[in-house]
């Protein structure tokens, strides 16, 4: 691998075809013009069409790699963690354990986005004064979150589980380069109804950009009432096998949905096809 004018050149072998990608500063990949349509070993020629098809396959692969899955573990989120970043953009670990490094990465990418996250956190938690990502050089480079309340500074391991969860959700949903797909497990865990309402609103704003799809799982009737019936997919088990259905497609629910919200229908067992 070599570098020239801040451009990275890499050789890739796909189906025995060898060619060179050029990676721009934007992260986009292109075929280096000098080699476009020609095998490096001169064994044969490859068409531009084939090359472009390989690039499409690579784009799909990188898109999948950037999918964001979240099943947060506040205990791991509160502990100092070593910096492991190897690229310009990083994903939040599914358990949220690298939240400090993830926030530090956001700060470096776009300071305004970071400050917006802090301001929203202040709105949710009025006692918050500031948020910092602290770095320690003892026993290696470790980073951790520190929250300022009045005149007290609290490290992440002293913060509530709800605070850590809200912070992780805001960071992922406000990221300057949001993931193409975000999947959040039991999003309401540790959150009060007011915070759930705000997070759902954040999801709506992100989805409206049409750059990201968000899938959440929940057992909360309150959260379901914040959604339209058409946005809900019910998962049930039938003889041990998962069954997926859209309650909005049930004709028997049309009249019920005029009187009750999805959350109430859920508690009444009306969303189920068995109901």
Residue spans of the language-model regions?
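Conserved ABC ATPase signature
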Residues: 115, 119-174, 181, 187-194, ...
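Short, mixed charged/polar active-site loops
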Residues: 9, 151-154, 242
């Amino acid at each position: 691998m070599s570098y020239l004018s801040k451009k990275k050149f890499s050789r890739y072998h796909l189906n025995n075809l060898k060619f060179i990608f050029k990676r721009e500063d934007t992260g986009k990949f292109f075929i280096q013009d000098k080699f476009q349509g020609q095998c490096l070993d001169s064994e044969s020629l490859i068409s531009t069409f084939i090359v472009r098809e390989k690039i499409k396959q690579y784009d799909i692969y990188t898109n999948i790699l950037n999918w964001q899955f979240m099943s947060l573990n506040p205990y791991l989120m509160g502990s100092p963690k070593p910096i492991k970043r190897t690229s310009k953009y990083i994903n939040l670990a599914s358990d949220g354990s690298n939240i400090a490094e993830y926030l530090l990465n956001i700060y470096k990418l776009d300071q305004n986005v970071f400050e917006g996250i802090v301001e929203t956190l202040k709105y949710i938690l009025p006692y918050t004064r500031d948020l910092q990502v602290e770095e320690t050089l003892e026993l290696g480079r470790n980073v951790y979150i520190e929250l300022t309340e009045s005149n007290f500074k609290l490290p992440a391991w002293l913060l509530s589980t709800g605070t850590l969860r809200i912070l992780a959700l805001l960071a992922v949903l406000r990221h300057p380069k949001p993931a193409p797909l975000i999947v959040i497990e039991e999003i309401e865990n540790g959150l009060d109804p007011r915070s759930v309402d705000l997070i759902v609103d954040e999801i709506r704003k992100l989805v409206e950009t049409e750059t990201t799809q968000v899938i959440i799982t929940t057992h909360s009737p309150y959260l379901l009432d914040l959604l339209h019936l058409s946005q809900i997919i019910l998962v049930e088990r039938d003889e041990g096998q998962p069954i997926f259905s859209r309650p909005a497609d049930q004709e028997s629910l049309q009249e019920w949905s005029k009187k009750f919200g999805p959350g109430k229908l859920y508690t009444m067992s009306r969303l189920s096809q068995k109901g």
